[in-house]
Amino acid sequence: MSEEQTAIDSPPSTVEGSVETVTTIDSPSTTASTIAATAEEHPQLEKKPTPLPSLKDLPSLGSNAAFANVKVSWGPNMKPAVSNSPSPSPSAPSLTTGLGAKRMRSKNIQEAFTLDLQSQLSITKPELSRIVQSVKKNHDVSVESTLSKNARTFLVSGVAANVHEAKRELVKKLTKPINAVIEVPSKCKASIIGSGGRTIREISDAYEVKINVSKEVNENSYDEDMDDTTSNVSLFGDFESVNLAKAKILAIVKEETKNATIKLVVEDEKYLPYIDVSEFASDEGDEEVKVQFYKKSGDIVILGPREKAKATKTSIQDYLKKLASNLDEEKVKIPSKFQFLIDAEELKEKYNVIVTFPSTPDDELVSFVGLRDKVGEAITYARSSSKSYVVESLDISKAHSKNLTHAKNLIMYFTKYSVLKGLEESHPNVKISLPSIQSLPTAETVTIHISAKSDEANDIKAVRKELISFVNNIPPSETLVITDLDYELFGGSIKHCLLASESSVAFVQFGDYYPNDNSILLVALTEDEDFKPSIEEIQASLNKANESLNSLRTKQNNMETKTYEFSEEVQDSLFKPSSATWKLIMEDISEQEGHLQIKLHTPEENQLTVRGDEKAAKAANKIFESILNSPSSKSKMTVNIPANSVARLIGNKGSNLQQIREKFACQIDIPNEENNNASKDKTVEVTLTGLEYNLTHAKKYLAAEAKKWADIITKELIVPVKFHGSLIGPHGTYRNRLQEKYNVFINFPRDNEIVTIRGPSRGVNKAHEELKALLDFEMENGHKMVINVPAEHVPRIIGKNGDNINDIRAEYGVEMDFLQKSTDPKAQETGEVELEITGSRQNIKDAAKRVESIVAEASDFVTEVLKIDHKYHKSIVGSGGHILREIISKAGGEEIRNKSVDIPNADSENKDITVQGPQKFVKKVVEEINKIVKDAENSVTKTIDIPAERKGALIGPGGIVRRQLESEFNINLFVPNKDDPSGKITITGAPENVEKAEKKILNEIIRENFDREVDVPASIYEYVSERGAFIQKLRMDLSVNVRFGNTSKKANKLARAPIEIPLEKVCGSTEGENAEKTKFTIEEVGAPTSSEEGDITMRLTYEPIDLSSILSDGEEKEVTKDTSNDSAKKEEALDTAVKLIKERIAKAPSATYAGYVWGADTRRFNMIVGPGGSNIKKIREAADVIINVPRKSDKVNDVVYIRGTKAGVEKAGEMVLKSLRR
């Protein structure tokens, strides 16, 4: 040969010990020009070729120092797995040619491999020669071979692809086929086979290898890390093709199992509160390992790349072992009555120690679990803290004549309804511990424990007192115990009936706590009523609740009862809850939707009692009679199923058959497969052996299942791969919904467009329709458009918390995704970000327009900063910000979302006012601000003197008057606080505006605007005003309003002063023969007086109601007013009002008597008032008295108070009594 051979560094591969291969390539140091030049210098080398090239056959290429000696890398005596590639010396000169040609790498390679004689087919030398010549011709390669004692070595030269194919053909034709078996995870079998067997066919056809994937699972092959078993895949063919196919299959397995989900279960619950797995989750981008801990179930789930997940599992197991060694549990014996003193929450927070109290009343061992050094500290702290408590016991079984049963009932009532919760909340420092309901049946006393810290012992007495009151207020007569309804039959129905009356009668079903207890406790609720009902009323409410259960009693009385003879052994075997027969019986009875009770070993050990309503009892009797008539467990029954359904009936390794056997507790015999081969299209007779009742159900089940199996079909739908994700849905939502809805299996292949749907024909067709409709929708709405948006405006498109982009998505029904971040190099370079919009064509266009409008709006966004002196800021903002709001409104800011006017706080040194928004808006706002500043620069400030008591009128309710003045006259009005009497009121603004504002303030707002003024001594004001009724009379009769100036507060206080009523004297008797309905009492009390000094100023103003604007027929008419007539009416009304006030003042000294009318029925007091107050007005005018009818909410609400002269009081009293008697 004329080219130097260099061996590759990697060792040759060996397959089944029969082939050894060495692959060589042309040296890169040898060029075509070098070889040509050398050939001219040494022509003799071409004339004497040697069959086996060696180093001496190669031409000399420059200095000999450039290369080391190289052994022959092939031939009969070659030794495999040794690489002899020479490396040039560092001092070697580079090889050059006189032509200066560029060096080139040859595409040719050489590959040597060895075949053991044992693995070769027995062929003659001519046959071998014929095969070699055929390979050389078919693949355009050079093939040479040598034979040694135990092997034959081949050297194949040529283009790389051709060499590999030539080698495959040589190995295939010269060697015996082999059978290789590899184990693969069972979950990977579907991927290896592919949709419709497509993947496995491709591998088999490509490498001409027969591949068989076993349906069975290898025994003892479960791997808990993979959560899977393994199955065998066998490959038959020549060893080279088998290895290539094996590599392809293992690549699929590697891809399918690259990620793992590993579950660790923490068996011991006491470790759960202390486990923290956050440190085990790695953060390596796509290679992240996620660890989740489910505290309730105790499961630790690890998700991530398989090897990393396994390593994480090992780390967590080590962590759990270390945690287990550090945790300790100590049990301390603590009497039950003191266990409640241990604050488990406090110990958990302070020492991280979990306290578990015993579940049974007899158990006094309390468990403390935590870190070894903390458990002892926690127990010590619990002991010391409990010593600081004082505990008192209250034995409520001593109440109500030592009625122990009633005391137990009260505890059940208190527990269910948390009756004592309000008491605990009102005394937060006191703990109340009720005995557990489980301990009540055997308890000889019922003791409630009350505890508190020593320094709060007084609270215990208060709580004890209230507890005694609670117990005493619920005597046995206010409860009722019902025992005639069966809880097992009607427990749910009883609860439903009693819930309707729970607001008045509480109830406790003992069956909720104790098995086979039919007792129901009813408790009458009387706490919410003002007066406790009589015992008759309480009994009536209890009986009403009891009677609501009569419909259930009727059902119970109408129930049929029947007893069957079954031996004790048969009942324990056939009818125990876990038996297959019992489950079938319960299924049959539940279909009847009735009430049924089955009691085993009742009334005798060898008897069974059935009780229920007609429908359910009839079904149960039929079942038990059939079992009695055919009690043998050796009964036989046959069922015919299609032959093609037998495999499904049996299932994988008989799993389905075993499940059916267990479900119906019967033996199922299927004829051998050999007997069925000739009748694949016919049915197979399956024999069932067992209890006849079970066999009837099994036969029905098998017939239905066989029909379902025979109806299984597969349908295909072509779905472009890009739509797979949309049809599968997030986390498989859509696919899972269809699979569950139609009981089908839907397979989406990874790299294929054909989606398969398999299952019952009806379900497959329905699922196919829905999937096709969804695909059509996705294809219609799957159009995409990419638009470029400026990176600086991306936040504006997204909006706060994504509001803007979510609104666009919802409005136009599109998906929007930014393909880059604003910080990406490409985005920073171009200044734009790509936004992808997915949806229908029209919706995409509309959404794109919306985005463009946002970008345009953002582009129009400007910022302008004004430097304004602080003294003008208040003028710009205005009182309550009303001026600033007006500025924004005038500039059109109400319809603009992205705008702002930022004015510094009063205490800030910053003078900058920042205006942001569209150019037009900013321009208008700036103009308005500059205008205000200009006006403020030309403004004047004027001080006005206003009495301190009138400052409030200038401000108005909530500052409304001041704001109106500032807005109306464009001024700034300063009113000092009430606490600053020396403060001056100032008006700042344009001179003409200040003058107008001052005029309005002085002439309209603070002017004392009244017509007459009368001073009434405060001591008799209550009588003069008739507690406000006289003021109302002036307003209604004379159109005269009364105001009180600075004495308003005092006047209101006197008019509403509480009335002192001597209840002992005036109240009548309500009991016995002397019971009264009304009582009238009169006494002399002296002239009206009050401790208040000074006068009450009554300022009278004539304010008639103007009815001129109320026109008839909806037409406006001019009404000519007679000014002189109105003035005369005004004077007359004012004179009359003043006269009436003075008369009341003159009569006050003679109003020395008070009258009290008591009424047993306060509901009749409205008869005194009359419609619209007409009757009471009539009494006041006729008797000239003060009369006060109490409200229901008054402290004393059953006495009418009268004040006046003796004659007036007597007359008024008679009129009141007359009104009550009507």
Curated annotation (Swiss-Prot):
Keywords from the named record: Endoplasmic reticulum, Membrane, Nucleus, Phosphoprotein, Repeat, RNA-binding
Gene Ontology molecular functions: G-protein alpha-subunit binding; mRNA binding; RNA binding
GO biological process: chemotropism; chromosome segregation; meiotic telomere clustering; pheromone-dependent signal transduction involved in conjugation with cellular fusion; silent mating-type cassette heterochromatin formation; subtelomeric heterochromatin formation
Basic and acidic residues bias (residue ranges): 39-49
Phosphothreonine, modified sites: T50
Biased amino acid composition, Polar residues: 1-12
Chain segments annotated as transmembrane: none
Subcellular localization, as worded in the UniProt entry: Endoplasmic reticulum membrane; Nucleus membrane
GO cellular component entries: chromosome, telomeric region; cytoplasm; endoplasmic reticulum; endoplasmic reticulum membrane; fungal-type vacuole membrane; nuclear membrane; nuclear outer membrane-endoplasmic reticulum membrane network
Positions carrying Phosphoserine: S54, S63, S85, S87, S89, S630, S1112
Role summary: Involved in the control of mitotic chromosome transmission. Required during cell division for faithful partitioning of the ER-nuclear envelope membranes which, in S.cerevisiae, enclose the duplicated chromosomes.
Protein name: Protein SCP160
